[in-house]
C-alpha cells in the first residue's frame, strides 16, 4: 500500500483565507494610544473590543458574520455544497464557485482550492466512504444487539459494494471524468489510500480476522471486483443497473468458491489485470468512446 506524505483531508494545508472575503472592518488602522487621552474611557473601551473581535466575513448581501470555523471546516462546507452543481458544471472549479455562492459567499472563495476539480472528487469519495462505514457500523451493532441476523460473507460483501456504488448514481454521467481525475499521477496516492481503506472496512465488518497472506489476497480480490463492477456500471443501461448487480453477484460468488491457495493466487493476479483493463476502459470513456447509453 502506498503511504501518503500529505493525506487528503487529514493534514490541513497552510492556513490562509482569501482577501476577497475579508471585511473592511479589519482594515482599520491600529488603535492609537494618543487618541485615548482625547476620548472618553467608554469610547476607548469600545475601540479596544472592536480590535479584539474575531475575524469576520462578508456575504454577498454585504452582511457580516463572525468566523467560528477553521479554514478546513469552511473548505468542507464549500465542497459539500458544490456537489449539487456537479451535474451541470462537472467536477470543476466552476462547481465549487457555485457551491460557495449557494452559501452566500463570494465566488472568489474558490481560490482556496489549488486543484478544485480533483479536490472535489476526493472530497466526494471520502464522504461516500464515511457514509458506508456508518452504514456498516450500524448494521454491525444491530447484529451485536441480537435484533438482526449476521449475513453470510458473500451476501454482506455484495450488499456493501452495491451500497457504495449506488452513491455514484446521482453523478453517473460525470463519473468517467471523476475516474480520470482519480487516475492522474498526483491523485493516485490519495485514490489508492481511499480505495484500500474502503475495502478493508468491508472485510472488517464482514468478520474477517485473518492475519496471514490471505489478508492481502482477500483485499486484492475485492478491490478487483469493486473496480470492475464500477466500470460495468458506467456502461449499464438496464433499469436500476440490474445488469451491474448481476455482474457483481457473479463475481462475489466466484470469489467465495475459491478452494485452495493456488486458486487464490490466480484470482489475485486476475484482480490486478482487471484493474489495469479498467483503467484502459476509463480512458476510452473519457475520450468519448464506449459511453454509457
Curated annotation (Swiss-Prot):
A 1,2-diacylglycero-3-phosphoethanolamine binds at residue 219. GO terms for cellular component: mitochondrial inner membrane. Its main location: mitochondrion. Residues 29-38 have a biased composition (Polar residues). The keyword Mitochondrion applies. InterPro entries: COQ9_C, COQ9_HTH, Ubiq_biosynth_COQ9. Residues 61-72 have a biased composition (Acidic residues). One of its GO terms (biological process) is ubiquinone biosynthetic process. Belongs to the COQ9 family. Homodimer. Heterodimer; two heterodimers of COQ7:COQ9 come together on the same side of the lipid pseudo-bilayer and form a curved tetramer with a hydrophobic surface suitable for membrane interaction. These two tetramers assemble into a soluble octamer with a pseudo-bilayer of lipids captured within. Interacts with COQ7; this interaction allows ubiquinone (CoQ) isoprene intermediates presentation to COQ7 and facilitates the COQ7-mediated hydroxylase step. This is Ubiquinone biosynthesis protein COQ9-B, mitochondrial. It comes from Xenopus laevis (African clawed frog). The lineage of its organism: Eukaryota, Metazoa, Chordata, Craniata, Vertebrata. The gene is coq9-b.
